[in-house]
């Protein structure tokens, strides 16, 4: 059986660990990078009917869609599995960042924001609490439409490598705004599991893998 997973550089450890666990259980895991194109490709593979489970760990494309970054996947991300009835785990991974190109390509209106230079061609901008509230509302709205078995997992300590404590995108208020909005807008019957961990902690990655197996 084929499982698809969404990954970013900042969620590599989480996806890698979950992938190992699932492969040991006999699944084939195909990883898609959440670059806009990657998210759309994953959605279309799910629509094709070849996928048995979805490990949607990286939701970052919504931040680009909302704020105007360069890696948006369009307005239909997180729809295919719900419509196709495919069991899904959803994590709001990397909703702490918007992707831009070289620093001089970042719109002037964001000049006062917090940035991280991932490499000379990639500039990341920290989402603020207001944006995170809206992202939580958008993601919850997509999940509310699922007819498939779905569980939402929240890593309360960090949504990426660089938002962990001591790192440049650590922002408790922004993360809390996101988590609160997801909880507030989700239908009550949708299961939400919280873990006091960072997204790349092996315990959280194993929780992702086990939770998907439980749904399948």
Regions found by a protein language model. Give the residues of each.
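Metallocofactor- and cofactor-centric catalytic cores in central/energy metabolism, strongly enriched
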Residues: 1-91, 100-102, 113, 124-216
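Long amphipathic alpha-helical segments with strong coiled-coil/leucine-zipper propensity
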Residues: 96-97
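A solvent-exposed, charged loop/short amphipathic helix patch at secondary-structure junctions
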Residues: 106-123
């Amino acid at each position: 059986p084929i499982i698809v997973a969404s990954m970013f550089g900042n969620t590599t450890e989480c996806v890698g660990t979950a992938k190992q666990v699932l492969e040991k259980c006999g699944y084939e895991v195909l990883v898609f990078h959440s670059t806009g194109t990657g998210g759309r490709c994953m959605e279309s593979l799910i629509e094709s009917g070849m996928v048995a489970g979805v490990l949607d760990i990286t939701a970052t494309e919504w931040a680009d869609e909302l704020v105007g970054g360069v890696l948006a996947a369009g307005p239909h991300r997180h729809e295919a599995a719900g419509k196709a009835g495919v069991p899904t785990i959803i994590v709001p991974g990397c909703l702490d960042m918007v992707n831009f190109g070289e620093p001089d390509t970042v719109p002037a209106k964001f000049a006062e924001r917090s940035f991280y230079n991932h490499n000379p061609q990639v500039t990341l901008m920290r989402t603020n609490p207001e944006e995170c509230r809206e992202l939580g509302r958008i993601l919850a709205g997509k999940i509310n439409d699922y007819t498939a078995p779905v569980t939402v997992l929240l890593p309360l300590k960090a949504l990426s490598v660089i938002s962990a404590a001591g790192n440049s995108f650590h922002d408790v208020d922004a993360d809390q705004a996101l988590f609160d909005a997801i909880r507030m807008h989700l239908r009550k019957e949708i299961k939400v599991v919280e873990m006091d961990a960072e997204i790349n902690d092996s315990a959280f990655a194993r929780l992702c893998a086990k939770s998907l197996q439980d749904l399948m």
